[in-house]
Amino acid sequence: MRKTNSIKSVELSPFPYVIVEDFLDEETLDLVIDALAGLEYSFSESDLFSYWASVKLTEIDHPALNVLREDLGDKVWRAEVAKAFQVSKLSKIDMAAYVYGLGDFLLPHDDQVENRVIAYSLHLTPDLEEEDGGSLDLFEANKAGKSKLVKRIIPKFNSLNMFEVSDTSWHQVSEILTDIQRLTLTGWYHV
């Protein structure tokens, strides 16, 4: 189960984002990780990304994933996310699991697809260190396409990172530099 129903203040630079630490209780967290370990992942690669991805988790009926979908997508939490980011009512979520291994990455992009308003990523890898790679990097960008890295977030186990999707919400997952596997559950809140 979700351990909180509130979101602390949203950071505004380089674009609105927040980190909710210790998001799930230990029992739910263990069940979710076990459920994700039992899924099949497909390798996806292009010049923009390299990672392993699950199917859409909104299409899987599994007790632990059903609880997680409720924790991330129930009316109370969606209202809290909308309030924190000062956006209109959020209608639905989608989600998938991603595994980044040695050499995998996701280059800078803005997530603007299909009425996405807020992106989120629940980090499920314990003890990820900066030297492992796999940081969530946020860029300051302008409409002319110029950008620079201004914030590097080392994913903390059981933390939920969320940010507003816009034409300036450029971000990336830095290349994995060691043999660690970076497991995240990622998705979007839609209007």
Label the model's feature ranges.
Residues R2-A84:
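Non-heme Fe(II)/2-oxoglutarate
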Residues D61, N66-E70, W77-V191:
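Catalytic core of non-heme Fe(II) oxygenases with the double-stranded beta-helix
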